[in-house]
Amino acid sequence: MINKDIYQALQQLIPNEKIKVDEPLKRYTYTKTGGNADFYITPTKNEEVQAVVKYAYQNEIPVTYLGNGSNIIIREGGIRGIVISLLSLDHIDVSDDAIIAGSGAAIIDVSRVARDYALTGLEFACGIPGSIGGAVYMNAGAYGGEVKDCIDYALCVNEQGSLIKLTTKELELDYRNSIIQKEHLVVLEAAFTLAPGKMTEIQAKMDDLTERRESKQPLEYPSCGSVFQRPPGHFAGKLIQDSNLQGHRIGGVEVSTKHAGFMVNVDNGTATDYENLIHYVQKTVKEKFGIELNREVRIIGEHPKES
């Protein structure tokens, strides 16, 4: 049963049309899985995020943040408390050699804006399906580039609802890691310092990376992107492939036959299917090679109640 006090309090903080109750989250994830959120809100201003976070902190209400749901699995039991979608914080502004983008802006779009202004440095992101907030959260990268190579600062909100501006060094960006994760912060916007380049050369590089991505990744099915982090000295996909796991299926989810590092939803798969397949792959690779595969994809939410 939804708490009316929380609903009424949220109505005082943000417009009513930005509040959804008992909202199905599978609408907002690339895997097309997930239960319902007690409250799902879509702020369009930084101040609205701050106000809701501050209220939630003062009243001990859990808060979960969502970008575009590309590298996340939400369990069928859903998420209690307040889910804040950051997708409407999607501004992209250019000033000289810098780009400032809102948390909800797609990093693909930001890389395209950089190209349009003949700014080089974000070509690596032309095929990453995440939002800016998610990209900073996990220091997203591809094809030899990553967020930490070009980010200047990130404007964040802490658990108490206060604004914090963090420099590149303060963000502690590492392989798929950052201070954002450790301190439970949320990114509102990020600034990137780029370099002047030639638009034709930037476009050529983006075309090459796009072709490589499309030829190797199973983009025809819903998926959560790259499932595992790269183990030191190895490639997760190669270990999975050498374990003869490509095509292995649990429920409606299977290890992609096109790229072993991906798991695709081929037949109405559930978050439970994903989670079980992830555990099976981890167990098999550990037994065969003695190597632990750590998840890159986030798994959140409550397990479904047994009927």
Curated annotation (Swiss-Prot):
The entry's keywords: Cell cycle, Cell division, Cell shape, Cell wall biogenesis/degradation, Cytoplasm, FAD, Flavoprotein, NADP, Oxidoreductase, Peptidoglycan synthesis
GO BP: any one term: cell division
Reactions performed catalytically: UDP-N-acetyl-alpha-D-muramate + NADP(+) = UDP-N-acetyl-3-O-(1-carboxyvinyl)-alpha-D-glucosamine + NADPH + H(+)
Locations listed in the record: Cytoplasm
Pathway(s): Cell wall biogenesis; peptidoglycan biosynthesis
PROSITE patterns reported in the protein's UniProt record: FAD_PCMH
Domain FAD-binding PCMH-type: 33-197
Residues forming the catalytic site: 176, 226, 296
Class in the EC hierarchy, top level: oxidoreductase
Gene Ontology annotations for the cellular component aspect, listed alphabetically: cytosol
Catalytic activity, EC: 1.3.1.98
GO molecular function, one term: FAD binding
Keyword ATP-binding: no
Protein family (similarity comment): Belongs to the MurB family.
The protein's name in its UniProt record: UDP-N-acetylenolpyruvoylglucosamine reductase
Organism listed in the record: Staphylococcus aureus (strain JH9)
